[in-house]
Swiss-Prot record:
Single GO cellular component term: small ribosomal subunit
Subunit structure: Part of the 30S ribosomal subunit. Contacts protein S5. The interaction surface between S4 and S5 is involved in control of translational fidelity.
Family to which this protein belongs: Belongs to the universal ribosomal protein uS4 family.
Protein name according to UniProt: Small ribosomal subunit protein uS4
HAMAP family in UniProt: Ribosomal_uS4_B (MF_01306_B)
Annotated source species: Listeria innocua serovar 6a (strain ATCC BAA-680 / CLIP 11262)
Its job: One of the primary rRNA binding proteins, it binds directly to 16S rRNA where it nucleates assembly of the body of the 30S subunit. With S5 and S12 plays an important role in translational accuracy.
Region described as Disordered: 22-43
InterPro entries recorded: Ribosomal_uS4, Ribosomal_uS4_bac-type, Ribosomal_uS4_CS, Ribosomal_uS4_N, S4_RNA-bd, S4_RNA-bd_sf
């Protein structure tokens, strides 16, 4: 399945989550596109709930179905809770860390920065959004990209940086200083539904 590249607000309204990070797409019409109002939602089956939860998380991180399932399978080989390990692996993606550092306003924009070669890991350019960042690795903006307008605009509006990452706005350098706790990740996601979905 290809990655969705259409308007994010449509997906946000359909799934009931904000992909922009602002929540504005849900303020005026907090129901799926095509519906005439919030009372038009049909009763969802257990399978439907599980599938919807999977889609929420997949679109939140902007992954294809194959990428999503591969990461899920990788998480299953780790010690600990499958669902929590899955969430943490998603959070360790390079494009997500770039987003968490405030270098991009959305994960989609962060993925473009990585794809276009604006980001380095431990001093080496990495253009693979799915690259798994390890604790202690240094993420930086390339010197040639330091004046990138998209990065500058994002830094102007970004204020919250999670405790598990550190960022120096002067040097445009950050790092993953520890793995995140589940309580620090998306509270609106019930990863148990996703584990159940793939266990069917």
């Amino acid at each position: 399945m290809a990655r969705y590249t259409g308007p994010s607000w449509k997906v946000s309204r359909r799934l009931g989550i904000s992909l922009s990070g602002t929540g504005k797409e849900l303020e005026r019409r907090p129901y799926a596109p095509g519906q005439h109002g919030p009372t038009q939602r049909k009763k969802i089956s257990e399978y439907g709930l599980q599938q919807a939860e999977k889609q929420k998380l997949r679109h939140m991180y902007g992954l294809t179905e194959r990428q999503f399932k591969n990461t899920f399978n990788k998480a299953g080989k780790l010690q600990g809770k499958h669902g929590e390990n899955f969430m943490i692996l998603l959070e360790q993606r390079l494009d997500n860390i770039v987003y968490r550092l405030g270098l991009a306003r959305t994960r989609r924009a962060a993925r473009q920065l990585v794809n276009h070669g604006h980001i380095t890991v431990d001093g080496k350019r990495v253009d693979i959004p799915s690259y798994q960042v390890s604790v202690g690795q240094v993420i930086s903006v390339r010197e040639k990209s330091a004046k990138n307008s998209a990065i500058a605009e994002s830094l102007e509006v970004s204020s919250f940086v999670p405790e598990y990452v550190t960022f120096d706005a002067e040097t445009l350098t950050g790092s993953l200083n520890r793995l995140p706790e589940r309580s620090e990740l998306a509270a609106e996601i019930n990863e148990a539904f996703i584990v159940e979905f793939y266990s069917r």
